[in-house]
Amino acid sequence: MKASTVIRFPFSVRRSVWLNKYSTFRIGGPANYFKVVHSASEAQQVIQFLHSHNYPFIIVGKGSNCLFDDRGFDGFVLCNGIQGKEFVSETTIKVYSGTSFSFLGKTLSSSGYSGLEFAVGIPGSVGGAVFMNAGIGNQDTAAVIESVEVINSKGEILSYNTEELGFGYRTSRFQHCNEFILSATFRLSRNSSSVKIAKDLLRNRLLSQPYQQPSTGCIFRNPPGNSAGKLIDEAGLKGFSLGGAQISPKHANFIVNTGRATSQEVKQLIQIVQDKLKSQGINLEEEVRIIPYQLP
């Protein structure tokens, strides 16, 4: 079904919602239809309906790794607002995907649980962390995942174990399908030093990354054995700007919105960086999720 087709939804939706309000980049035009779901049953109903009508849609969480188009999105944006957590054993916790990943890491480390200290300061949701296999250095989400619950195209809830999740460096199976991540179960351990570890990681992030300006975090994946930020800096592009988009003077793997950046300016800046590095024999892949106005 075309996104322009007038459709009657059997649930409440909002129309022409500006996506810049749902992106940490503060960029993006209006979505045709927009809905925040707060429960599994609500998500099941929406997903089943959209799939059965072959209606184009995307799933977003806190929008911390999304670059929306200036024109918006010609389709349905399903925003995940399902939050909550529960311990299923002394050191195993099930967390719903709309929960803040950073807040989860802070809460657990403050309570003496280790495993997710690295999450403190990562601005996305638990679902986003699973989707991207978020991490820092040699620590990532995959290392502490026990299982993930999803909602499939039929509205059914399925569970995947770690081996079925296709985890790799900043990647997972979910980047190649449109399954709705419902929850993740994490394996933790007890560690009295966890709160100090989390604080040290957060301090280093605040010192090295431009948290005061809108961005989506790292724009590029690190090439094997190297640092994208270091390579961009060495190429002389640190601080380079195009319109309202700028390669951060603080961390060269961040593009920041200095006030009125457009998605087109950000994409052009990404291309400039890629072309410059390619001339040196280095291919940089985007880590940011670039969402087109219309799905292919």
Curated annotation (Swiss-Prot):
<comment type="function">
    <text>Cell wall formation.</text>
</comment>
<keyword id="KW-0961">Cell wall biogenesis/degradation</keyword>
<dbReference type="InterPro" id="IPR036635">
    <property type="entry name" value="MurB_C_sf"/>
</dbReference>
<keyword id="KW-0521">NADP</keyword>
<dbReference type="GO" id="GO:0008360">
    <property type="term" value="P:regulation of cell shape"/>
</dbReference>
<dbReference type="InterPro" id="IPR016167">
    <property type="entry name" value="FAD-bd_PCMH_sub1"/>
</dbReference>
<dbReference type="Pfam" id="PF01565">
    <property type="entry name" value="FAD_binding_4"/>
</dbReference>
<keyword id="KW-0963">Cytoplasm</keyword>
<keyword id="KW-0131">Cell cycle</keyword>
<dbReference type="GO" id="GO:0051301">
    <property type="term" value="P:cell division"/>
</dbReference>
<dbReference type="InterPro" id="IPR016169">
    <property type="entry name" value="FAD-bd_PCMH_sub2"/>
</dbReference>
<dbReference type="Pfam" id="PF02873">
    <property type="entry name" value="MurB_C"/>
</dbReference>
<dbReference type="InterPro" id="IPR011601">
    <property type="entry name" value="MurB_C"/>
</dbReference>
<comment type="pathway">
    <text>Cell wall biogenesis; peptidoglycan biosynthesis.</text>
</comment>
<dbReference type="GO" id="GO:0071555">
    <property type="term" value="P:cell wall organization"/>
</dbReference>
<feature type="active site">
    <location>
        <position position="287"/>
    </location>
</feature>
<keyword id="KW-0274">FAD</keyword>
<dbReference type="GO" id="GO:0009252">
    <property type="term" value="P:peptidoglycan biosynthetic process"/>
</dbReference>
<keyword id="KW-0560">Oxidoreductase</keyword>
<keyword id="KW-0573">Peptidoglycan synthesis</keyword>
<keyword id="KW-0132">Cell division</keyword>
<keyword id="KW-0285">Flavoprotein</keyword>
<feature type="active site" description="Proton donor">
    <location>
        <position position="218"/>
    </location>
</feature>
<dbReference type="GO" id="GO:0008762">
    <property type="term" value="F:UDP-N-acetylmuramate dehydrogenase activity"/>
</dbReference>
<dbReference type="InterPro" id="IPR036318">
    <property type="entry name" value="FAD-bd_PCMH-like_sf"/>
</dbReference>
<dbReference type="GO" id="GO:0071949">
    <property type="term" value="F:FAD binding"/>
</dbReference>
<feature type="domain" description="FAD-binding PCMH-type">
    <location>
        <begin position="26"/>
        <end position="191"/>
    </location>
</feature>
<dbReference type="InterPro" id="IPR016166">
    <property type="entry name" value="FAD-bd_PCMH"/>
</dbReference>
<protein>
    <recommendedName>
        <fullName>UDP-N-acetylenolpyruvoylglucosamine reductase</fullName>
        <ecNumber>1.3.1.98</ecNumber>
    </recommendedName>
</protein>
<dbReference type="InterPro" id="IPR003170">
    <property type="entry name" value="MurB"/>
</dbReference>
<keyword id="KW-0133">Cell shape</keyword>
<dbReference type="InterPro" id="IPR006094">
    <property type="entry name" value="Oxid_FAD_bind_N"/>
</dbReference>
<dbReference type="GO" id="GO:0005829">
    <property type="term" value="C:cytosol"/>
</dbReference>
<comment type="similarity">
    <text>Belongs to the MurB family.</text>
</comment>
<feature type="active site">
    <location>
        <position position="170"/>
    </location>
</feature>
